[in-house]
Structure formats: structure tokens, C-alpha cells
Design a protein with these regions (language model features):
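Membrane-interface helix-loop junctions at the exits of transmembrane helices
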Residues: 2-3, 50, 81-91, 120-141, ...
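Hydrophobic, aromatic-rich transmembrane alpha-helices
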Residues: 275-297, 304, 308, 354, ...
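Membrane-interface junctions at the ends of membrane-embedded or membrane-associated helices
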Residues: 115, 158-169, 200-211, 288-294, ...
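Active-site lumenal/periplasmic loops and adjacent helix-entry segments of GT-C-fold
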Residues: 2-115, 120-149, 261-267, 578
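Extracytoplasmic
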Residues: 11, 15-18, 248, 371, ...
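Membrane-embedded helix bundles of polyisoprenyl
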Residues: 105-114, 119-203, 212-230, 236, ...
Length: 628
């Protein structure tokens, strides 16, 4: 981390418009591009909105406009993301990653100490969990924030199940929030299920189980401002219908990565599994307690189930085909189970050594095994992530500078792999494409009128020039003013006009790309009848328009409708008749009007109300039963 930011920004040397000017070298981590194309642009957008005093509820720069807080993976409400959110990418990104590792290690150590493992065994488990192959591989992704918080939840849930206190109740609620706010609901659900099983095993009687479950429910309510908008967005997404879902399991040959972490076959991220050979052997030794210990049986069962649902077999194939979850993601939970088993195995081995060699020799041997496991894991972690100098995170080009200086509302349509989806979010440009786990289903249907979108090996959501729809009417209606493409592609304005009936003119050609202007583009805000519209205020979640209509007509704002958008004409609520995914339309009478169109999602307000109620309930419970 001292050499630069753990980011694969060097992938931009293979993508336009940066390819001609970005320092060209071999891409260090070609599969770790999601942070570059998704998470960093989202972070920069969130910082812009928060610095302006606005909640980043809506992202106008992706897929025509989509919920931002509701996409879950933005993860801006997680304390583990706070360093990056407060300090920016250059100063805060690595701090956020380091914080995730530290929280995971400390939480795992404290939990293992609480279940009566020795210091050496707890240290071993902490290393196996916090710097395991899966933890390091997914470190730049939001999923790592979910995983880092699990041992803390295990620790506090175990204590609450054994001793009733206000502090314990509040601790479980807050730890549950940390897991849910991490930015990966799929993994969070798996984690909560694992913690629930472990807690039920520890609790004696139904009362401890009920109070622990109630505390977790309060934690769910604390996260409601994130979960309720996510549920709404998911219900309207293509993902809810299983569209574009990759159905896969991990090859059985990928089990070799437990022994050889840098094997060259398969995907080095999804298949990452090493917990060190030392740790794996100690975990197998810990299975010797499987008959005597319910805890060992439970965590051995968890490890077995994770392997079964992740690696190729009839069960995993059935789950992959017929359920909406990516079960291979559960592999990131495996170091938790193996860490517990290895800690148990180390203490068992130490007890045997103590009887034969004495206390001091047994302690030295245990410490040596911990050091060996840590060294093995650190060696395996080297080279997983790329290192980017801070000055290379946000390179710009003449073409991009030209676009970002234009003040009027417009959309762009990069063709082929030019400016990969979501990159526009960092630049403040409105793109019709997007790259996200969930995408509005209705918008994808509307967008088909622009052309046939596909994917390539390196970029998702691609419109090739040859796949443009004839006529270009959808480009005009949706305010797509500029088409961007590689300078070496043989598609000039004249050729596209001739082949597809467009009306484009080339206004820029440089080493960084070709910029074509759509001369037929319609304004973002316009009237169907005669009159004028002036945009006086434009924010992510609010538009203010001065309208002068000569007759009763319809005001069209060419942004895709989504639940939560509201309209007011001269301060009075006005109906929006548009269907989800179609342009926002508001009827106005003849004359001058001030129209405000704002995003006020009921889902967020409902979630915020649930959060406030949870805080009140939490305060009352702590006050009633006392803190300690």
C-alpha cells in the first residue's frame, strides 16, 4: 500500500479515450476492474453530492438515471467506507481497505478468545480470516466490508445469548447494521444465517435466542434506509427476472488453490480460497474434536456446505440454475469456519506437545506455526492487486475536457468499448449505458430502440456501431447529443448517416477519440406544443424549469420515470402519468409556470422512519434494562 493505491487503473491503458496517453504497460490485475469502473466513480459522485449538502439518492449519469443509495453496492453508509468517503480516493482508499483488514482481524481474534481459544490460536484464526485468499481477492469490493464485520457480530451475539444487558443488545443491533450496510446484500444474508445458527447453538433456552433475534431485528431496522430502497429497486430490476445472470459453479480443479494460491487456471478472484497449508492442516486436525464439541460440528458443517454449494457437483449446479443467488460467493465465508477449526486444532496440538515437551516448547511450537501460516498468507497476497500512483486515478483527455465544460443537459452514447459504462459518473456526464448488479428492467426495454446492446470480454453493456438502430429516433428523443468512438474505427459521421439514416457531424477527431454531434437531438426538457422551457436548476434529484406554454400541453423531461419522482407546478402537486422507464411527462396549462420535478422516494422515507423507530426502541430497551 505504500507504493500507491490498490487499484487496477492501469486497465485504462487498454481503453479509449485514455489508451493513447495513459502510461502503457502490462495490466497488473486485469480481472479486478470493477473498482475502477464502478466503485471509484460511485465514490466520487457520492462525495460531490455530500459536499453539496445533498443525499446521493439518485445517479443521473448511469443508465439514463438510476437509484444510487438503492443499488446497495454504493455502501456509503458503512463506517468501513468512511475514510474513502471523507478523504477521497487519493488519501482515503487505502485507509478504507486497511480498516477492513484490521476490523476483520481484531474481530476474529476477540471472538476466538471469547470461545476460549488461546492467544496463539486466536492469532492464527485472525490471520486466516483477515488475509486469506478470498479476503484479499475481494478486498476492493464492498463484499469485504460485509465479511469484516461478521466476527464482531458473532462475538456480541454470543455474549448477549449468555448475558442480558443493554450494552449487549445495542452491540448486536449495531453489528447487524454493520454487516447489512457493507454493500452486498447477498453475502450479508448468508452471513446472518451463519451467525444465527452459531448463536442458536450457544444459547441455552428460548429466551436468549429470542432476545438475540430481537436485537438483530433492531439492526435490520437501523439499516432500513438502505434495505427498503434496495428492495424497491430490485423488484423493478432485470436481475429480479434473472436476466443476464451468469450461471456457473467453480471447477473441482479450483480446489487446488487451497494449496497453490497463484495457480494460473480459472478466475483468480472467484476461485481464491487459500487459508495457508499450515492453517488447512490444523483445521483438519481440529476435526478430531467433532464428536466431543458441538461448535466443531457446526463449523465443520458450515465449511462442508460452503464447499458443496461452491464447487461443481449436482447440488451446486441445481442451486445455480434454479435460485437467484451466486452461491460461489459463499466461499468468502469459508476462512471463518476454517479459522475456527484451525484454532481448535492448534490448541489441541499444543496440549499434546505440552504433555510431551513441556509448556515452553509447546508455546514456541505453536507460535512458530502461527508465524509460518502468516508468512504463507502474506506471500500469497503479493501480486493480487495492482498498484496505481494517485495521479493516475483520474486521467483526462482533450475530448473529455471538451464534454465536461458544456453546461446544458445532454447525454452521451459511447460506442464499442469507448469510455466503459459508469466511467461517465466520475466525470459528471449522463450516459445511457450502465454497469451494475441490478438495472431498471423498464429502461432496458426502452433503450432497445437505440440499438442492440451486447458485451465484450472486457466491457459490459456495449453498443457496437453496426448495431445502431436505423433512423436514430430514440437518440433524438432521449437527448443523446454526442456519440463517442475510437479514432481508428472506420465509422465516420458520413458512413453512419448513410447506413443508419442519422444526422451526425464530426466536431472533434484526435488521438483520444472521435466525437460526433447529433444535429437532430431534442432538448432534455421540452414542450409537445408551442412554447419555451428554460432549465433554471439541475441537480441529481431536482429539476426546476421555467415554462411558457402558448396552449395547454405536456412538458416532457427526457429522464426515465422511476417510483419516487414527483412534480409540482407553481408549488402545487401535479400528477406524472408516465410509466416506469418512459420520459417524465407533466401536463401544464397555457401561460407561464414554474415546474419542479424532484426525486422523493417513499422507500427511503419509509426506511428512515423505521430507522428512527429502531433508535427509539433501542434507547428504551437500554434505559429499561440498564447498560451493563
Amino acid at each position: 500500500m505504500n507504493r500507491g493505491l490498490l487499484l487496477s487503473s492501469d486497465v485504462k491503458s487498454r481503453c479509449w479515450p485514455w489508451a493513447s496517453s495513459y502510461p502503457r504497460s502490462e495490466v497488473q490485475a486485469p480481472v479486478l476492474t470493477d473498482p475502477v469502473w464502478q466503485f471509484v466513480p460511485w465514490l466520487e459522485f457520492a462525495r460531490r453530492e455530500l459536499n453539496a449538502g445533498r443525499l446521493p439518492l439518485w445517479n443521473p449519469h448511469q443508465n439514463g438515471g438510476v437509484p444510487f443509495l438503492g443499488n446497495a453496492q454504493s455502501a456509503i453508509a458503512s463506517p468501513l467506507f468512511a475514510p474513502a468517503l471523507l478523504l477521497g480516493v487519493e488519501r482515503g482508499w487505502n485507509l478504507s481497505l486497511l480498516l477492513r483488514i484490521l476490523v476483520a482481524a481484531v474481530g476474529m481474534y476477540l471472538w476466538l478468545r471469547d470461545v476460549e481459544r488461546s492467544r496463539a490460536a486466536a492469532t492464527l484464526g485472525a490471520l486466516m480470516f483477515s488475509i486469506s485468499g478470498p479476503s484479499i481477492a475481494w478486498l476492493e469490493h464492498p463484499i469485504s466490508m460485509v465479511i469484516a464485520s461478521i466476527p464482531i457480530l458473532l462475538l456480541l451475539a454470543r455474549r448477549l445469548a449468555r448475558e442480558h444487558s443493554g450494552a449487549g443488545f445495542a452491540g448486536v443491533a449495531v453489528a447487524t447494521y454493520l454487516v447489512l450496510a457493507g454493500g452486498h446484500p447477498e453475502t450479508a444474508a448468508m452471513a446472518v444465517a451463519v451467525v444465527a445458527g452459531a448463536t442458536a447453538l450457544e444459547a441455552h433456552g428460548w429466551r436468549p435466542r429470542v432476545r438475540t433475534a430481537l436485537a438483530a431485528c433492531v439492526g435490520v431496522l437501523l439499516a432500513a434506509p438502505l434495505l427498503v430502497p434496495f428492495a424497491e429497486y430490485l423488484s423493478l430490476s432485470a436481475a429480479a427476472q434473472g436476466e443476464d445472470r451468469a450461471v456457473f459453479t467453480l471447477s473441482v480443479s479450483a480446489l487446488g488453490r487451497f494449496i497453490v494460491p497463484h495457480a494460473t487456471t480459472g478466475n483468480p478472484i472467484t476461485e481464491a480460497s487459500t487459508v495457508s497449508v499450515v492453517g488447512l492442516c490444523l483445521a483438519l486436525f481440529g476435526l478430531g474434536h467433532i464428536r466431543r464439541s458441538r461448535q466443531v460440528r457446526y463449523w465443520a458443517g458450515v465449511a462442508f456446505l460452503i464447499v458443496v454449494v461452491s464447487y461443481d457437483n449436482p447440488v451446486s449446479r441445481l442451486l445455480a440454475l434454479h435460485t437467484p443467488l451466486y452461491w460461489t460467493r459463499s466461499l468468502i465465508l469459508l476462512p471463518l469456519a476454517l479459522g475456527f477449526l484451525a484454532a481448535t486444532g492448534l490448541d489441541s496440538l499444543r496440549s499434546l506437545a505440552k504433555r510431551r515437551l513441556g509448556e515452553r516448547s509447546a508455546m514456541l511450537a505453536a507460535s512458530a506455526l502461527v508465524v509460518m501460516a502468516g508468512a504463507e498468507l502474506l506471500a500469497a497476497a503479493r501480486g493480487v492487486h495492482a498498484v496505481t500512483p494517485p495521479e493516475d486515478v483520474d486521467p483526462t483527455t482533450p475530448l473529455l475536457r471538451r464534454l465536461t465544460t458544456e453546461s446544458e443537459p445532454f447525454r452521451i452514447l459511447p460506442l464499442h468499448t469507448f469510455l466503459p459504462p459508469d466511467s461517465a459518473t466520475a466525470l459528471g456526464l449522463d450516459d445511457v449505458r450502465g454497469y451494475d448488479a441490478i438495472t431498471p428492467r423498464a429502461w432496458l426495454r426502452e433503450r432497445e430502440a437505440m440499438g442492440r446492446f451486447t458485451s465484450t470480454n472486457i466491457v459490459t453493456d456495449v453498443l457496437e456501431p453496426r448495431n445502431l438502430a436505423p433512423g436514430g429516433r430514440a437518440l433524438d428523443l432521449w437527448n443523446v447529443k454526442y456519440l463517442l468512438l475510437h479514432p481508428q474505427l472506420p465509422y465516420t459521421a458520413e458512413r453512419l448517416n448513410s447506413e443508419f439514416g442519422l444526422d451526425l457531424e464530426e466536431i472533434y477527431l484526435g488521438s483520444d477519440g472521435r466525437l460526433l454531434r447529433n444535429r437532430r437531438v431534442l432538448p432534455r426538457a421540452r414542450l409537445r406544443g408551442e412554447g419555451t422551457v428554460h432549465v433554471t436548476e439541475r441537480r441529481a434529484t431536482r429539476w426546476r424549469l421555467d415554462v411558457d406554454a402558448r396552449e395547454s400541453t405536456v412538458l416532457v423531461l427526457a429522464n426515465p420515470m422511476f417510483p419516487g419522482w414527483r412534480a409540482r407546478v407553481d408549488g402545487k402537486r401535479a400528477p406524472i402519468a408516465s410509466r416506469t422507464g418512459t420520459p417524465i411527462e407533466v401536463r401544464v396549462s397555457a401561460g407561464r409556470h414554474t415546474v419542479e420535478i424532484s426525486y422523493e422516494p417513499l422507500s427511503f422515507r419509509l426506511g428512515a422512519g423505521m430507522c428512527v423507530a429502531a433508535l427509539f426502541v433501542l434507547g428504551m430497551i437500554v434505559w429499561r434494562i440498564g447498560w451493563s
